[in-house]
Swiss-Prot record:
The keyword Transmembrane does not apply. Residues 228-249 are annotated as: Leucine-zipper. PROSITE patterns: ZF_RING_1, ZF_RING_2. It holds the Pfam family zf-C3HC4. This is Major immediate early protein. Plays some regulatory role in both viral DNA replication and transcriptional transactivation. GO terms for cellular component: host cell nucleus. One of its GO terms (biological process) is viral DNA genome replication. Gene3D superfamilies: Zinc/RING finger domain, C3HC4 (zinc finger) (3.30.40.10). Keywords: DNA replication, DNA-binding, Early protein, Host nucleus, Metal-binding, Transcription, Transcription regulation, Viral DNA replication, Zinc, Zinc-finger. One of its GO terms (molecular function) is zinc ion binding. The lineage of its organism: Viruses, Viruses incertae sedis, Naldaviricetes, Lefavirales, Baculoviridae. The keyword Zinc applies. It is found in: Host nucleus.
Length: 321
């Protein structure tokens, strides 16, 4: 068989990154981008939540301070003293404070009734299906009641509701308690409201500064992400180029080995077949295809050119008579 004796001095072949390495590097870059994006979104959401929470607290503090100021002004006003006689039970009530008056007036007329009689009217109407509450004096239908209070009018409406029977006095106390809770929000440490507001303002300023810093960091991360995306694009182009080269090199590596083996007609047929099989296996063990491909890489290493490689090896074995 012909042998190549010019391939004695070989240099190290040029090593290129494999497709698997490029894919792994690309996946690592994408995972890094996704992790940075998630961390950035979580930090921004946390900062926005803290800023909103501080703003709500400041608004609540402002409302509480305003309500306290209004209640203080109301308490400092002179007490209005007057007497009132209920038109139903004829009991006389005297007003000696600026709290909610203990009597109600229908919104449809000007007749006043004590709170106890109004609750009795509502209770009687609730016990009768499809009944309405009317003024006992003018028989005008009453849908809502109003309670007089200095500088304010409180309007209330009764609804039918299944519940345990509560004495009218207790109902009156419960409603007064609800009105007081709605009119004034309880505040702890009233003397330190100003200090708390200043502290909240300082915290908000610090959070805004931190938010600005996070935005700058976000811009930097976005710039790094763009660089990583460009790097990924470049790696994708390299992968496509290598895939194209692989598709181009695959047909070029085809090596045709034609083996022509004679036979001795005088020998038994099984001996001829055994000889032919051993020759085929010996030729395949010579690695002719791999050797030619190694020579091709050595010659064209480091260049984009690639020569076609089509080698025909003819092996003739004659039999001596």
């Amino acid at each position: 068989m012909p042998r190549d004796t010019n391939n004695r001095h070989r240099s190290t072949p040029y090593e290129r990154p494999t497709l698997e390495d490029l894919r792994r590097q690309l996946q690592d870059n994408l995972d890094s981008i996704n992790r940075r994006d998630r961390m950035q979104e979580e930090q921004e959401e946390n900062l926005r939540y803290q800023v909103r929470r501080r703003q709500r607290q400041n608004q609540l503090r402002s409302i509480q301070m305003e309500q306290q100021r209004m209640m203080a002004e109301l308490n400092n006003e002179p007490v209005i003293n007057f007497k009132f006689e209920c038109s139903v039970c004829l009991e006389t009530y005297s007003q000696q404070s600026n709290d909610t008056c203990p009597f109600l007036i229908p919104t449809t007329c000007d007749h006043g009734f004590c709170f106890k009689c109004v609750i009795n009217l509502q209770s009687n109407a609730m016990n009768i299906p499809h009944s309405t509450v009317c003024c006992p004096l003018c028989n005008t239908q009453v849908k809502m009641w109003r309670s007089l209070k200095p500088n304010a009018v409180v309007t209330c409406k009764f609804y039918k509701k299944t519940q345990e029977r509560v004495p009218p006095v207790q109902q009156y106390k419960n409603i007064i308690k609800v009105l007081q809770e709605r009119s004034v929000i309880s505040v702890e440490d009233n003397d330190n409201n100003c200090d708390i507001n200043m502290e909240n303002q300082a915290k908000i300023a610090a959070l805004e500064a931190e938010l600005e810093e996070e935005k700058n960091h976000s811009d930097q991360v976005a710039s790094e992400n763009r660089q990583l995306i460009e790097e990924n694009t470049r790696l994708n182009e390299q992968i496509q180029e290598l895939q194209h080269q692989v598709r181009t090199l695959v047909p070029q590596r085809g090596i045709t080995v034609n083996q022509q083996i004679g036979r001795d007609d005088s020998a038994p047929a099984e001996l001829n077949e055994r000889f032919r099989s051993l020759v085929y296996s010996t030729i395949s063990e010579l690695f002719i295809e791999n050797g030619v491909h190694s020579i091709q890489n050595y010659v064209y290493a480091g260049t984009s050119a690639a020569s076609s490689c089509d080698v025909n090896v003819t092996v003739n074995f004659g039999f001596e008579n």
